[in-house]
């Protein structure tokens, strides 16, 4: 990294719930003199069935670096496995083409698992918020 160049943090968001928690982090990254935001939108955000919540991110004015659609399979155990496999491949391709200095994920949904797996295999440092939290319902 050249002197004065910002470190790039890829923030992965797949749902409205975790985006609400990541929004302040994204805002701080945008304002940072040392770090830059590389916002990657995936999962339910890009699904008509789940409300196309990417529009909320756009309304907030946050720049979206990439949109990675992954919900192409049925909501079955096999379909989820297929989604995870495809998502790992898509995240790996994106991270390889436009490598961040760090990948930031929140939670443990399968799209987050896929992004974390790709980052780990590619030896990109991973920051993980709220992994292992227990949710009910």
Task: Please report, for each region that a protein language model flagged, where it lies by residue.
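Conserved nucleotide-sugar phosphate-binding/catalytic loop shared by glycosyltransferases and other
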Residues: 36-80, 90
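Membrane-targeting and insertion segments and their boundary/processing signals
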Residues: 27, 61-65, 119
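Anion (oxyanion) recognition and catalysis
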Residues: 30-31, 58, 120-121
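Flexible, glycine-rich phosphate/dinucleotide-binding loops
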Residues: 18, 46-48, 135
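N-terminal subdomain of nucleotide-sugar transferases
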Residues: 1-44
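Active-site and donor-binding regions of nucleotide-sugar-utilizing enzymes
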Residues: 8-13, 20-25, 71-137
